[in-house]
């Protein structure tokens, strides 16, 4: 569970946690709001408890929500099956139309990921055919 600004508290909303503000350090809601999150990670709102609201000096009204690390789409030259685990290594540094698959936000070099499913293929100018996978942590 965590706290999300009420205007963003809807199932499926995704966000990258950018870190806590200075005002968060002394806040009584800090443990449920920011303590469980890691800077630079992608999170998704899984459910919202509309009855639980709190006031925040930074974001205004906050709503209690179920928050989890979001699945991410990554490109790989390797052929993988559903359920396979692998260590993430960026496949390319080019600034092209597929960069969001090769260096997706929310994933860090060396992360252990698990394949949820294959989503399709892309044709990379540098590496050739790559597969796009939905992955979880």
UniProtKB/Swiss-Prot annotation:
Q: Which domain of life is it from?
A: Archaea
Looking at the UniProt entry, the stretches that span the membrane are none
Q: Which family does it belong to?
A: Belongs to the UPF0179 family.
HAMAP family named in the record = UPF0179
Protein known as? UPF0179 protein Kcr_1409
Q: What organism does the UniProt record list as the source?
A: Korarchaeum cryptofilum (strain OPF8)
Higher taxonomy:
Archaea, Thermoproteota, Candidatus Korarchaeia, Candidatus Korarchaeales, Candidatus Korarchaeaceae
């Amino acid at each position: 569970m965590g706290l999300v600004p009420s205007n963003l508290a809807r199932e499926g909303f995704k966000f990258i946690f950018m870190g806590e503000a200075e005002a968060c350090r002394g806040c009584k809601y800090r443990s449920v709001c920011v303590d469980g999150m890691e800077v630079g990670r992608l999170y998704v709102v899984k459910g919202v408890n509309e009855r639980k609201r709190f006031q925040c000096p930074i974001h205004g009204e906050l709503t209690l929500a179920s928050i989890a690390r979001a699945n991410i789409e990554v490109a790989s030259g390797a052929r993988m099956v559903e359920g396979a685990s692998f260590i993430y290594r960026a496949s390319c540094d080019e600034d092209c139309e597929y960069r969001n698959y090769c260096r997706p936000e929310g994933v860090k070099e060396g992360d252990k990921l698990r394949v949820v499913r294959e989503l399709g293929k892309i044709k990379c100018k540098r590496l050739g055919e790559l597969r796009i996978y939905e992955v979880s942590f």
